[in-house]
């Protein structure tokens, strides 16, 4: 499901693996025909994040950079359009040796090639690949097919993590697991079984719900990770550690931690909590309004830069939005 925090969950998972002494890189696979995000409306798509080599991509790439303390490149981003463009260019250059080039297997094979290439370039122990969109969408089926093929090729080196939302309807007051059950069944129909489920919700996951997800989704209770809303996103890696997410990941790959370097991240979160003296900062922009809603996603990196600068000075930033179009009139 879009907008539930898959990007932050990916970045946070990478952070806890970094804290264990492993090298990590991250990729985003967007299910758009657009070759990159440069032509997309920021109100609809959110911020267009630009990598150091000029690639215009999804805002989640910014979260990866901030959490992993790394500079990512065009090799860390792909769209359906970009993958198709690459395959067609290879066909024109006769790189397929006269074969009939088909959607399957050639498109998923190009996706897999890009994932492995990102690992080689970063010399990474872990490559975290976020597949955008929602399970069941026809747009991301080729990325799911690539995941299936990769897991079939290297079952001991591939893990599938499902980020699923568990709603708590106000009129009922009870957390519902049905959307997660259906998401897993849709994955099963694509030949995939999640190894871990990150259960997103407004409140922590309780034991009865964990057991229910375990039974209906064919997964160990220990691999159902509670991922409730946090006061600020940089708290999420610490929440994942409390849920022993890194332990479950390393167990899957039969690895042991190299280090325990969580102190620096704890210090960051402590500084954020202690930054209480407010400072007002205005941001002038035009990509705010979408129907009846006011969104700030178009300026995500600006917002995060302001927050980090304020926290460094032990201040709590209070951001005010100034619509440039109103002042132009």
Q: Language-model features: where?
A:
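Flexible phosphate-sensing "switch/lid" loops adjacent to ATP/NTP-binding sites
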Residues: 1-329
